[in-house]
Amino acid sequence: HQPRRQRQMCIRDRRNAVEINNAFAINYMEITDIKKQSSKYQITAINKLNGNKFTFFANNIIAATGVHALPGDYSVKSSGIKFSGGAHLILKDDPLKINGNGILLPKTEDNRIMFVLPWFGNTIVGTTDTETFSGTLDRPRANNEDKEYIIRHIKKYFNVDNVEYTSSWSGIRALIDNKLTSTKNVSRGHFFNNVDERFIQISGGKLTGFRLIAKESLELLFSDNFELT
């Protein structure tokens, strides 16, 4: 389960776009094809709730598809990304006695960091960083290896013999594929790929930087010299 506050922030930001800036937001609508038609883009989409299909046109496209490739003819133009799985555990109440404080575990066995955070009366511990993951891109899940990794570090740093968790979840990071290093060393920064005229794709980045990414996307898309190298 994704933390509630992240969901609330995403919903609030979308509502602000609709109510304040007259945006039009659609959930559960999958874009299945994009084709260039003269100076516009023809977009085919399907409503995932009822199966209805739609066709509409756009002058400009900003694609922030995360781990998913662009559809149709543009799939081969998607920037290379590397998947990284990140699992978390939720512990009931405050078994580690952090007393409402966030704690950073400075060094894991694979030279990363982990965190322990209070969350709605419970405790979150995470996260892993692995190039393999269980489940699907749409529904990833924490596997036994992920859980054992987190529990092993809890026992080490908090000197406890038993760790019980109430739930777990996993997410997939879409990182820039540099072909050279493991996911733990890949930058969490974002960059823009010039897919076509007035069509850019965002790769990498983190949720915490979404406002900056949106600002830079619009500045780039509507600049007089729209070119990326």
Predicted regions and their residues:
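A conserved short coil-to-beta-strand element within the FAD-binding core of flavoproteins
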Residues: 27-41
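Core beta-strand elements of the Rossmann-like FAD/NAD(P) dinucleotide-binding domain
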Residues: 49-60
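Short, conserved active-site loop motifs that form the nucleotide-linked donor/cofactor pocket
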Residues: 7, 23-24, 199
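Single conserved hydrophobic/aromatic residue that forms the stacking wall/gate
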Residues: 1-11
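Short, surface-exposed charged micro-motifs
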Residues: 24, 33, 57, 113-115, ...
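Short, hydrophobic/aromatic-rich segments at coil-to-beta transitions
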Residues: 39-43, 99-100
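C-terminal catalytic lobe of FAD-dependent flavoproteins
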Residues: 12, 17, 69, 73, ...
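Short, well-ordered coil/turn residues at beta-beta hairpins
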Residues: 62-65
